[in-house]
């Protein structure tokens, strides 16, 4: 199994295997692994933003990525909230589990798609979603552009 497949499968799994793995690595390996993960997350974010733009081009507002969307996580009970924000110290003596089911298939498909995608042929700069109402620099640029409108 490729190291990136192993890493991404642990990262996307809903357990603490990723943290157990990370706790056993040295700093240089950890930073390298984080860089690999962020490259794939940037690719996924790029796909999501392009998909959102396609939906908006046909008049559908995809709420999850729109500027007006306020809710990041839906909590059905307080236990979900507690699990998300409870920062329990990492135990390194546990076993790392690797899901070789659908999650592993997803990771392999993601890696293949990134490799064969036209998006991946050019170097992907880190993709970030900018909310123009909250980004001061972007808002200032937009104000300058609006004030320089040429009237006919």
From Swiss-Prot:
Q: What is its main location?
A: virion
Q: Which UniProt keywords apply?
A: Host cytoplasm, Late protein, Virion
Q: Which subcellular locations apply to this protein?
A: Virion; Host cytoplasm
Any Pfam family: Pox_J1
Q: What induces it?
A: Expressed in the late phase of the viral replicative cycle.
Name the domain of life this protein comes from: Viruses
- List the GO terms this entry assigns under cellular component, sorted alphabetically: host cell cytoplasm; virion component
Subunit text: Homodimer. Part of a complex composed of the kinase OPG054, OPG092, OPG114, OPG115, OPG142 and OPG157. Interacts with OPG175.
- Member of which family? Belongs to the orthopoxvirus OPG100 family.
Q: What does this protein do?
A: Late protein which is a part of a large complex required for early virion morphogenesis. This complex participates in the formation of virosomes and the incorporation of virosomal contents into nascent immature virions. Plays a role in DNA packaging during immature virions (IV) formation.
Q: What is this protein called?
A: Virion assembly protein OPG100
* Native source species: Monkeypox virus
Which gene name belongs to this protein? OPG100
């Amino acid at each position: 199994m490729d190291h990136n497949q192993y890493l991404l499968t642990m990262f996307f799994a809903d357990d603490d295997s990723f943290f157990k793995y990370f706790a056993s690595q040295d700093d240089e390996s950890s930073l390298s692994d984080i860089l690999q993960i962020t490259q794939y997350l940037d690719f996924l974010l790029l796909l999501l933003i392009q998909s959102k733009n396609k939906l908006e081009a046909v008049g559908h507002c995809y709420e999850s990525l729109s500027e007006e969307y306020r809710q990041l996580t839906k909590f059905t009970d307080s236990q979900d909230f507690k699990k998300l924000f409870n920062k329990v110290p990492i135990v390194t003596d546990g076993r790392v589990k690797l899901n070789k089911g659908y999650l592993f298939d997803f990771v392999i498909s993601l890696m293949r798609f990134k490799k064969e995608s036209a998006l991946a042929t050019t170097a992907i700069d880190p993709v970030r979603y900018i909310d123009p109402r909250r980004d001061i620099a972007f808002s200032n640029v937009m104000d300058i552009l609006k004030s320089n409108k040429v009237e006919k």
